[in-house]
Amino acid sequence: MRILLVNDDGIHSPGLRALAVALQGEGHCVTVVAPDRERSAVGHGVTTRDPLFVQEQDWEGIPAYSCSGTPADCTQLGLEALAKGPVDLVISGPNRG
């Protein structure tokens, strides 16, 4: 299954990496796109006026990207540009909060 994994705690959240590794270990094709910092409590906010910056992360075989935007921005970028091909499932989490 092709999975897009996002969160609101940021790309450096240990739970995010653990889930990505576990999903890949089960044979899934995982792409991670997460905010470059903690972005809890922004709801469904999207960035409309500022440019978004994306940086590829070194996650040892798992495509992973940090984004300067909100979790919703990360989801949209993942679905429209960063995931290689169509996505079967989007998982948002895990969440420390």
Language-model features: locations:
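A cross-family phosphate/adenosyl-ligand binding-site feature
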Residues: 3, 17-86
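Short, glycine-rich nucleotide/cofactor-binding loops
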Residues: 6-12
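Short glycine-rich anion-binding loops that position phosphate/pyrophosphate groups of nucleotides
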Residues: 9, 38, 70-71, 95-97
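Short, Asp-centered acidic motifs that coordinate Mg2+ and/or phosphate
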Residues: 89
